[in-house]
């Protein structure tokens, strides 16, 4: 049976989060009433001339630098000609042969693997978004409505080389790409709102061959899981066709998420079908090196760099670092808390387990979380300084969630400071030994886990306030002096 290799390239459209559109002053706010954010330029009215949004250009350059691209000092815009109801001008302003960025790539790690992988980028180019068709929900009313609010919203299209060989690679590539775009704050990457969209180009070829097979482009992929599922389905379909000796045309398909299959939409157009030519209404762009370097100076620390620093400088486990750097806001929150606590590992544990536990449960962002990083840092500092136990800290955390008080105030008001009085702890330890003879006997016979029952008794009597280290040491000393169980 013939074996085949999968070839995957991805085209990602990311809306740039500018206040206004790429060639006009209309707003770009999502969710506004239909056709309320339009003007003569994005409506394609005669005589309306486009003017490039400088902020969009800067964000495109920022993305190129983040992905290690070469920034073109000479670039221009072209008209991509086609007819569709959501494209009022009859053409889209895009970039053809002189994109703003070339080369570069995306580094990512597949879950469970140690080594990272790298996918090259072909280019990043700027273009305007099209409008949106809204189809009637009533099958008896075959009408479609055009909303041009989105028309003219600035986009960058990030085109990869066909370097991916599995749907897993595509999935983790997209996650890494999204993380970088959000880190540098050029796009909110909200797939539900359409600000991040992906098309997958998929083909197969016999293993060992260096020739590409017939390519299928898959659209309508509204989540990374959909990308993965669509690729898996398409590879299976193309493999079955090849094994049966059948051929097919290069084509565009849609992903049907209900039927979980790809459906042919049209045979694929070639670039000459769009009759690209330079847009005569827009001058060419000649960038100065100083402009590019000015943008570079604003680039924040990227996810991989931050993750490596957390591991190498702060001594965090790789998993912790990956969780904390998945989003820039989470990493910022952790570092702000660490400035107060001074203990990286304890702060990491609290942020990734307790804080993100609440964030995920309530389906909110870290920015919407009610407890500031400074207050969490204060709580962790009390633990690190030995002033409260982990059990007491959980109680304080619950109080932090419903009040504006800081951890130290809560601990003082509720008298939760750890008890370090040797005589008082010794009294409770002696009581624990006397009242837990069965656990003592098990411990003396070699069952170390029995010690937990005795410690639990001490913590219960002290209402969780006894110093755990002192309790453990005192118990070990006292139990060690008892004769072994016969």
Swiss-Prot record:
SMART domains noted in UniProt: GatB_Yqey
Keyword Nucleotide-binding attached: yes
Gene Ontology MF terms in the entry: asparaginyl-tRNA synthase (glutamine-hydrolyzing) activity; ATP binding; glutaminyl-tRNA synthase (glutamine-hydrolyzing) activity
Domain of life: Bacteria
InterPro entries, sorted: Asn/Gln-tRNA_amidoTrfase_suB/E, Asn/Gln-tRNA_Trfase_suB/E_cat, Asn/Gln_amidotransferase, Asn/Gln_tRNA_amidoTrase-B-like, GatB, GatB_C_1, GatB_Yqey_C_2, Gln-tRNA_amidoTrfase_suB_CS
Catalysis: reaction(s): L-glutamyl-tRNA(Gln) + L-glutamine + ATP + H2O = L-glutaminyl-tRNA(Gln) + L-glutamate + ADP + phosphate + H(+); L-aspartyl-tRNA(Asn) + L-glutamine + ATP + H2O = L-asparaginyl-tRNA(Asn) + L-glutamate + ADP + phosphate + 2 H(+)
Enzyme Commission number(s): 6.3.5.-
EC class (word): ligase
Pfam families to which the protein is assigned, alphabetical: GatB_N (PF02934), GatB_Yqey (PF02637)
A Gene Ontology biological process term: translation
PANTHER family xrefs: GLUTAMYL-TRNA GLN AMIDOTRANSFERASE SUBUNIT B MITOCHONDRIAL AND PROKARYOTIC PET112-RELATED, GLUTAMYL-TRNA(GLN) AMIDOTRANSFERASE SUBUNIT B, MITOCHONDRIAL
Assembly: Heterotrimer of A, B and C subunits.
Protein family (similarity comment): Belongs to the GatB/GatE family. GatB subfamily.
Job of this protein: Allows the formation of correctly charged Asn-tRNA(Asn) or Gln-tRNA(Gln) through the transamidation of misacylated Asp-tRNA(Asn) or Glu-tRNA(Gln) in organisms which lack either or both of asparaginyl-tRNA or glutaminyl-tRNA synthetases. The reaction takes place in the presence of glutamine and ATP through an activated phospho-Asp-tRNA(Asn) or phospho-Glu-tRNA(Gln).
Protein name: Aspartyl/glutamyl-tRNA(Asn/Gln) amidotransferase subunit B
Gene that produces this protein: gatB
């Amino acid at each position: 049976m013939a074996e085949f290799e999968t070839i995957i390239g991805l085209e990602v459209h990311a809306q740039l989060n500018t206040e206004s559109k790429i060639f006009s002053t209309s707003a770009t706010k999502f969710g506004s009433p239909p056709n309320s954010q339009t003007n003569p330029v994005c409506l394609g009215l005669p005589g309306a001339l486009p003017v490039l949004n400088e902020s969009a250009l800067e964000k495109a350059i920022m993305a190129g630098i983040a992905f290690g691209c070469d920034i073109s000092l000479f670039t221009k815009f072209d008209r991509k000609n086609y007819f569709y109801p959501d494209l009022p001008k009859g053409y889209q302003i895009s970039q053809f042969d002189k994109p703003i960025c070339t080369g570069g790539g995306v580094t990512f790690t597949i879950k469970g693997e140690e080594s990272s992988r790298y996918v090259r980028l072909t280019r990043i180019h700027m273009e305007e978004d099209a409008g949106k068709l809204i189809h009637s929900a009533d099958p008896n009313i075959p009408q479609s409505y055009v909303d041009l609010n989105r028309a003219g919203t600035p986009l960058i299209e990030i085109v990869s080389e066909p370097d991916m060989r599995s749907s897993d690679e595509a999935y983790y590539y997209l996650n890494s790409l999204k993380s970088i775009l959000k880190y540098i704050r050029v796009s909110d990457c909200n797939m539900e709102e359409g600000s991040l969209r992906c098309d997958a180009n998929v083909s197969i070829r016999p293993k060992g061959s260096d020739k590409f097979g017939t390519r299928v482009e898959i659209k309508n992929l509204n989540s990374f899981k959909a990308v993965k599922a669509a690729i898996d389905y398409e590879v299976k379909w193309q493999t079955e066709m090849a094994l049966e000796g059948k051929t097919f045309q290069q084509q565009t398909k849609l992903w049907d998420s209900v039927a979980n299959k790809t459906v042919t939409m049209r045979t694929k157009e070639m670039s000459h079908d769009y009759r690209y030519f330079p847009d005569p209404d827009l001058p060419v762009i000649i960038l100065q090196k100083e402009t590019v370097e000015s943008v570079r100076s604003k680039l924040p620390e990227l996810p991989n760099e931050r993750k490596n620093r957390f591991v190498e400088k702060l001594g965090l486990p790789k998993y912790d670092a990956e969780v904390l750097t998945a989003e820039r806001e989470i990493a910022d929150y952790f570092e702000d808390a660490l400035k107060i606590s001074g203990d990286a590992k304890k702060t990491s544990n609290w942020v990734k387990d307790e804080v993100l536990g609440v964030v995920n449960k309530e389906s909110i962002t870290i920015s919407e979380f009610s407890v500031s990083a400074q207050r969490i840092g204060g709580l962790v500092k009390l633990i690190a300084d030995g002033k409260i136990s982990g059990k007491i800290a959980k109680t304080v955390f619950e109080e932090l969630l419903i009040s504006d008080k800081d951890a130290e105030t809560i601990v003082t008001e509720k008298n939760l400071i750890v008890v370090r009085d040797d005589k008082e702890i010794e009294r409770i330890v002696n009581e624990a030994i006397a009242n837990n003879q069965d656990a003592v006997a098990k411990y003396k016979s070699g069952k170390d886990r029995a010690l937990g029952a005795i410690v639990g008794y001490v913590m219960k009597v002290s209402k969780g306030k006894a110093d755990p280290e002192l309790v453990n040491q005192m118990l070990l000393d006292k139990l060690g002096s008892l004769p072994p169980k016969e």
